[in-house]
């Protein structure tokens, strides 16, 4: 079977090639479907990440779509059989979330900027131990965040529709916002919770709160984040995901600038890279091949999109 991989980066391609079975003929590109300009599907089975949009005209021409992602909101409504990878990167994303928290607490961007003058004024940061962390969305990733945070001595509360972990103290969103020093968004995206962390919502949080989003960019409207920073309501902001991310990624890759969150000393922006460890990329490659082999045998996916 021919499989075409979109949005594949160098290390990922190397891992996939290691695990490809003989009956799979693979083609790779770093482009999204839209960047590639493909008007017809290049293979019977295609694989994407979050920034490609499946053209409606490909329905009936493609047998299946494998998304190499833990989320699947970008596939909701697709009329082609779709699979995803729910388990490959939970710990990797959780580690990055805590990494971003630490970097903001210790004012790492300012530390780096002030090294050339070896200047320490204004660089006094904070420690994790004793801080109050609210994890919104206590699923696979959120659970790992809680484990790491508790090991660091943080006080942790969770917000979730399903309170399934006896070891986690759950609160309402409003109670959590009023309590937390730090908020991490690890939710699943649905059509009901777009813009969940709006200006109005985060204004109910304590002034100076640190906010991190490693889930989906649709939760955090860019204009709202700008206003909260300009008003000094957010003490720090870290994003790995972005509103209108597919358009933003294309603009940045083509050299366009002007993203309003760039260049702020209390903001850290990473290119949707929280999943990207050698261990997670290897798991992703193995599980992608599992999906493909299962699809060849059963015309369905081992982990289908619900």
Where are these regions (language model features)?
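N-terminal glycine-/charge-rich "phosphate-binding" loop or analogous flexible N-terminal tail
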Residues: 1-43
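Rossmann-like dinucleotide/phosphate-binding beta-alpha-beta segment
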Residues: 123-207
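Alpha-helix C-terminal capping/helix-to-coil transition sites in glycosyltransferase folds
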Residues: 41-42, 61, 178-179, 204-207, ...
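Short glycine-/small-residue-rich Rossmann-like dinucleotide-binding loops
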Residues: 50-51, 70, 187-189, 215-216, ...
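Phosphate/diphosphate ligand-binding glycine-rich loop within oxidoreductases
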Residues: 41-112, 126, 211
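Rossmann-like dinucleotide-binding domain for NAD(H)/NADP(H)
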Residues: 208, 216-306
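Beta-strand-loop-alpha-helix segment that lines the small-molecule cofactor/substrate pocket
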Residues: 59-65, 75-82, 185, 189-231
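Short acidic low-complexity segments
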Residues: 29-42, 56, 165-179
């Amino acid at each position: 079977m021919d499989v075409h991989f979109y949005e594949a980066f160098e290390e990922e391609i190397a891992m996939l090639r290691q695990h490809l079975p003989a009956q799979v003929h693979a083609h790779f590109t770093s482009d999204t479907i839209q960047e590639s300009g493909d008007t017809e599907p290049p293979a019977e089975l295609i694989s994407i990440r979050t920034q490609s949009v499946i053209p409606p005209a490909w329905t009936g021409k493609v047998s299946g779509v494998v998304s190499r992602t833990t989320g699947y909101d970008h596939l909701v409504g697709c009329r082609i059989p779709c699979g995803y990878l729910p388990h490959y990167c939970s710990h990797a994303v959780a580690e990055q979330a805590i990494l971003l928290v630490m970097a903001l607490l210790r004012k790492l961007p300012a530390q780096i900027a002030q090294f050339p003058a070896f200047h320490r004024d204004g660089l006094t940061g904070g420690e994790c131990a004793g801080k109050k962390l609210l994890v919104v969305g206590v699923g696979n990733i959120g659970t790992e965040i809680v484990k790491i945070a508790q090991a660091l001595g943080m006080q942790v509360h969770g917000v979730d529709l399903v309170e399934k972990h006896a070891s986690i103290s759950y609160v309402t969103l409003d109670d959590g916002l009023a309590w937390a020093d730090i908020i991490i968004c690890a939710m699943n995206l649905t059509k009901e919770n777009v813009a969940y962390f709006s200006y109005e919502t985060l204004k109910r949080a304590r002034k100076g709160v640190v906010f991190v989003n490693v889930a989906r960019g649709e939760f955090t409207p860019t204009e709202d984040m700008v206003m909260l920073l300009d008003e000094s309501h957010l003490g720090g902001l870290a994003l790995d995901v972005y509103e209108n991310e597919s358009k933003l990624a294309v603009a940045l890759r083509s050299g366009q600038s002007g993203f309003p969150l760039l260049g702020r000393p209390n903001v850290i922006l990473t290119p949707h890279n929280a999943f990207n460890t050698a261990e997670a990329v290897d798991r992703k490659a193995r599980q992608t091949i599992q999906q493909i082999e299962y699809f060849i045998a059963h015309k369905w996916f081992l982990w289908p999109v619900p």
